[in-house]
Amino acid sequence: MGARWPVLPTVLTALAVPAMVGLGVWQLQRAAWKESVLVRLAANAAAPVLVLGEAPIPRDAAFRQVVLWLDCPPVPPTPSGARLASGQAGFGWRLSCRAGNGSFVSVTLGASASPLDASAARALGEEASARSIWRGMLVERSNGAPGWLLVSRDALGPLAPAKAPGLESIPNNHRGYAIQWFAFAGTLAAIYAAWLARWRRARTG
């Protein structure tokens, strides 16, 4: 005589469906948190220029226009992917500089449509080392790297101003993820209910 109830499928479904619903609720909570962050960053972007000088950079300074003092080494900057202020794709040129409190700030000196030769890159580094006052937008570095990125408002040498990241560059897909988890839970529950109905018919048929 077979089992009166399909224990294993029932237990697995009873564990999986609440877990998926819980993940959906968690994503909704993350969405609310991300939306509050975006509101704060939008306020930062619209705020007046923050003159820091040699003071430490506040932790909530992302997307603020700032003026700060930096000590940059006379070395060639490194290239990175960037866009010119016009929107054209090109090369960004970054240099790691030291702020007044000893922390490091990666500075985007500007952007170019094509690579720079070695002599032009050396000249950029020398020009950057001669400057102490920097103006631009602060953003958090990508890929979880520590420290800040300053997108300089005033391009150096032959460079054009680089396009600073906008709020649209910050993903906010949590509500979509929540819908997916709720859909997974509903689909699994429906599949289990249909399978259970067939299982019962097979036992009574």
Question: Could you tell me what each predicted segment is?
Answer:
Residues M1-G205:
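Surface-exposed, charge/polar-rich loops and edge strands
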